[in-house]
Amino acid sequence: MRRPVIILLSLLLLSASMFAESGLPIIEVKADRTMIYPQRMELTGEETLMDILQMVPDLMIAGYEDVISNYNLRIDNCPLNGDTRLILSQMKAKDIAKIQVCDNTGVQKGTIGMARVLDINMKMPDALNGFVEGQGGFGKEVAGIGAVNALYGSKSTDLYANASYRHQEGNKEYLTLHMTNRFDDRNKLLTYFTQQYLDQPNGMSRKVMGRARYFHTFNDLGTELLLVGGYQYASDWSSSSKLPLCIAELNTPLFTKQLAMTLGFEGDFQMTSQKNTDQSCDVFNYDIYLQFTYALPKWRFTVGNRVMFYERKKKEGTISQKRSDTRDNANACVIFVPDHRNQIQLGYYRKYFNPAMTEAVFEDRSIHQMKLAYAYSRQKLTVQTEADYYMIEGGENLTELAASAYWKTKGLSLVGGSNLYIAKSGTSASIRFAPTAYLPHAWQIAMQVVYYTKNFSKREATGVPVYGCLSVNKQFGRHWNVGIDWHDMFDAFCSDATVNRHAANVKLQYRF
């Protein structure tokens, strides 16, 4: 009798823990970013990072190669200088612990203007796994792609490696290495190395970057110190630049567990020179940033500020121009969480556009943004809506309304959304729909469709009102996967298309 009781209690505890995990929200709204947790979703194992990103209201599949044009892709907050389309379509959601969609991180990350960050935190396996993949593109141009990806996890060391080569009107080579070393429970070191080499008809370019991030936890309360050092060199046919940087950041509870503080210093120094002229531009930034978050069971309040001391030196021949000034990015946000499924956000953000090197006068332009957002999430259903109003100094004020929804049922997932942009010069909109069917015998069929109204910038540039991509994949056993994408399919039927981009891309992948 005793043994069955023990077994029954064990099953009850297991089911309770599983219910608690499934009850956690897929989406978590923070003051300056939205967190997505793929491990809390119902996954088949074949979902990609690109599939998950279609849940976000602001992100759109604007083209086969133009996926996240407004976002800088990072892994553990380090820029990932790789083939973006390949990474998004190859990285599996089951290997991702957390996705941070950082749309207003001017305080925490020092983003400039409308720039945004897409930060990926990996879920490392207990051993080595990865894949080797080859692709062939057949359309107006013929393309060949080779890629290899590896993940390795152990108690003290994690390793992520990705390399790819693309031949299409030139050569593109990418390499990314990321290692995590855990020395003990309170000390870890993250190191990064990325390299890209592009040999295109318009010239050659290369970029090399190295970075190290050291974390030390002082106590059981979670007081943590972060130290960062890095260097990047970039060069193309017209210019070259050097960018060393350093960061020191402290994250800690303050007086009470409900109040969290981030205090940091960042220094970066960008030195750019033109190869065909005597023009050069050096920018030196020294930032101090401070942010407080006070969390109650149903409310979260955040206020932050980044004071940016900068000096710009521009030289052209014997003429030089210098400007030193101070500016500050700021945010203030309140989030109401009535229960674990619903979240409502109201926020204010101030940020700046940097002047371009080619501008005659160095002048910053400020951006003031108001944001109202709502998120609802369950394991198989998410709904997100967002309204933003931008007041842009020296530019046109803009209102953006966005909505997206994700629904998963047995054998089928549906993702859709819409974006509306309202300005004095005109109104434009887009509507997108992306269903995926998981069929018997390891078949998968997916479709991406995006419709643009007449005044939408993407439609004006391409002449095509609809973007479409049809994908078919088949898994053979544990190791082999074959797929084909027919992308930009509506270009073939549109007489107004400026460039006929429709093509078939065939993929063969071996997993180990």
What is the meaning of each model-derived region?
Residues E42, D126-A150, A163:
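Short strand-turn segments of transmembrane beta-barrel domains in outer membranes
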Residues L49-I52, L86, T111-G134, G146:
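N-terminal periplasmic accessory domains that precede
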Residues C78-T105:
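Short acidic/polar hinge/loop motifs at secondary-structure boundaries
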Residues M124-N129, T180-K188, Y192-Q195, T262-Q270, ...:
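Surface-exposed extracellular loop regions of Gram-negative outer-membrane beta-barrel proteins
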Residues L128, S156-Y160, D185-T191, N219-L225, ...:
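Repeated loop/turn-to-beta-strand initiation elements of outer-membrane beta-barrel proteins
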Residues Q135-K140, S154, Y165-E169, F193-D199, ...:
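Transmembrane beta-strands of outer-membrane beta-barrel pores
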Residues Q168-I247, C281, F353-P355, A360-D364:
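Flexible loop and strand-edge segments within Gram-negative outer membrane beta-barrel domains
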Residues C333, A373, T498-F512:
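Outer-membrane beta-barrel "beta-signal"
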